[in-house]
Amino acid sequence: AFLMTKDAEISIEVSPRYINGDYFLRGRKLGFNRISFGVQDFDPQVQLAVNRVQRETMFFQVMEWIRAAEFESVNIDLIYGLPYQTVQSFEATIAKTLRLDPDRIAVFNFAYLPNLKPIQKRIDPTTLPDSATKLTILQRVIERLTSQGYRYIGMDHFAKPTDELAIAQRSGDLKRNFQGYTTLPTADLIGFGLTSISMLQAAYAQNQKHLATYFSDVAAGHHGPQECGFNCTVEDLLRRTIIMELMCQFSLDKGAIARQFNLDFDAYFASELAALRELAADGLLHLGRDRLEVTPVGRLLIRNITAVFDAYLQQKSGRTFSKAI
């Protein structure tokens, strides 16, 4: 068992289709104080295409149960880029999400990876919105949610001004890990269960992906049923620091990086700065003598900007990964 501090942030993600009001009351008594659930999209045609049919009334009932159980914060996940989505249909989804009045909203880009996720082969790729449509959807989402008082947090999150994420962004303390944005300063993440990922200060590890292997490792008394792991080099930590700073603050103090890692920033990253000048010419960022500043337009393409500092990108060029937009 773990001993929890009184101010611990204990979150749980639930599937609205398989729970009732008692579930939330029990969860709250167990100490959970934050909760998240996925809507993805309210449009029936979109839901049917991704085999996730969910009644609209169900979400409002779930939100009533959550509020009655007095959870401190509620997050809703949406996904754009799904089959049959249009700018207009997703605007309707945003309007209904606002009626639910969550504290946080995460709006993720759909990763269409049929080679890695065979179940996605059931999706007709001709029904997917193109990149231009997805970019317009994201722009409209930002406009609508910020006009309703939500703060745009990083690449894909929105939060009410009183939420801890928004407060952390204003104070410059916002952090990001592979799960998303967080207020926790460089905390270690320990993954439990099948496929889970652990993240330590300078290392990553992923548990077994196959159930039989996972159980056999646990039964054998292995301290960690890991399938793979990775130790970060100083170079990895340097580039991770830069990428995370840009993704969280949309600016970079070159001098601070130079002092932290004892290097001449402009000389060390000469080729990266040359690539960034092309993006600057497109209006995505400003290159100052001491700082890099991402523009509002550049925020929409922050993955493209930070990719310049990804030393492994060329090694991965032969593999398929999700697109930035």
From Swiss-Prot:
<dbReference type="InterPro" id="IPR006638">
    <property type="entry name" value="Elp3/MiaA/NifB-like_rSAM"/>
</dbReference>
<feature type="binding site">
    <location>
        <position position="77"/>
    </location>
    <ligand>
        <name>S-adenosyl-L-methionine 2</name>
    </ligand>
</feature>
<feature type="binding site">
    <location>
        <position position="197"/>
    </location>
    <ligand>
        <name>S-adenosyl-L-methionine 1</name>
    </ligand>
</feature>
<keyword id="KW-0479">Metal-binding</keyword>
<protein>
    <recommendedName>
        <fullName>Oxygen-independent coproporphyrinogen III oxidase</fullName>
        <ecNumber>1.3.98.3</ecNumber>
    </recommendedName>
</protein>
<dbReference type="GO" id="GO:0015995">
    <property type="term" value="P:chlorophyll biosynthetic process"/>
</dbReference>
<keyword id="KW-0411">Iron-sulfur</keyword>
<dbReference type="Pfam" id="PF06969">
    <property type="entry name" value="HemN_C"/>
</dbReference>
<feature type="domain" description="Radical SAM core">
    <location>
        <begin position="1"/>
        <end position="151"/>
    </location>
</feature>
<keyword id="KW-0949">S-adenosyl-L-methionine</keyword>
<dbReference type="InterPro" id="IPR034505">
    <property type="entry name" value="Coproporphyrinogen-III_oxidase"/>
</dbReference>
<dbReference type="InterPro" id="IPR010723">
    <property type="entry name" value="HemN_C"/>
</dbReference>
<dbReference type="InterPro" id="IPR004558">
    <property type="entry name" value="Coprogen_oxidase_HemN"/>
</dbReference>
<dbReference type="InterPro" id="IPR007197">
    <property type="entry name" value="rSAM"/>
</dbReference>
<comment type="pathway">
    <text>Porphyrin-containing compound metabolism; protoporphyrin-IX biosynthesis; protoporphyrinogen-IX from coproporphyrinogen-III (AdoMet route): step 1/1.</text>
</comment>
<keyword id="KW-0963">Cytoplasm</keyword>
<keyword id="KW-0408">Iron</keyword>
<keyword id="KW-0627">Porphyrin biosynthesis</keyword>
<keyword id="KW-0560">Oxidoreductase</keyword>
<dbReference type="Pfam" id="PF04055">
    <property type="entry name" value="Radical_SAM"/>
</dbReference>
<dbReference type="GO" id="GO:0004109">
    <property type="term" value="F:coproporphyrinogen oxidase activity"/>
</dbReference>
<dbReference type="GO" id="GO:0051539">
    <property type="term" value="F:4 iron, 4 sulfur cluster binding"/>
</dbReference>
<feature type="binding site">
    <location>
        <position position="111"/>
    </location>
    <ligand>
        <name>S-adenosyl-L-methionine 2</name>
    </ligand>
</feature>
<keyword id="KW-0149">Chlorophyll biosynthesis</keyword>
<dbReference type="GO" id="GO:0005737">
    <property type="term" value="C:cytoplasm"/>
</dbReference>
<comment type="subunit">
    <text>Monomer.</text>
</comment>
<keyword id="KW-0004">4Fe-4S</keyword>
<feature type="binding site">
    <location>
        <position position="40"/>
    </location>
    <ligand>
        <name>S-adenosyl-L-methionine 2</name>
    </ligand>
</feature>
<dbReference type="GO" id="GO:0046872">
    <property type="term" value="F:metal ion binding"/>
</dbReference>
<dbReference type="GO" id="GO:0051989">
    <property type="term" value="F:coproporphyrinogen dehydrogenase activity"/>
</dbReference>
<feature type="binding site">
    <location>
        <position position="52"/>
    </location>
    <ligand>
        <name>S-adenosyl-L-methionine 2</name>
    </ligand>
</feature>
<feature type="binding site">
    <location>
        <position position="13"/>
    </location>
    <ligand>
        <name>S-adenosyl-L-methionine 1</name>
    </ligand>
</feature>
<dbReference type="GO" id="GO:0006779">
    <property type="term" value="P:porphyrin-containing compound biosynthetic process"/>
</dbReference>
<comment type="function">
    <text>Involved in the heme and chlorophyll biosynthesis. Catalyzes the anaerobic oxidative decarboxylation of propionate groups of rings A and B of coproporphyrinogen III to yield the vinyl groups in protoporphyrinogen IX.</text>
</comment>
<comment type="similarity">
    <text>Belongs to the anaerobic coproporphyrinogen-III oxidase family.</text>
</comment>
<dbReference type="GO" id="GO:0006782">
    <property type="term" value="P:protoporphyrinogen IX biosynthetic process"/>
</dbReference>
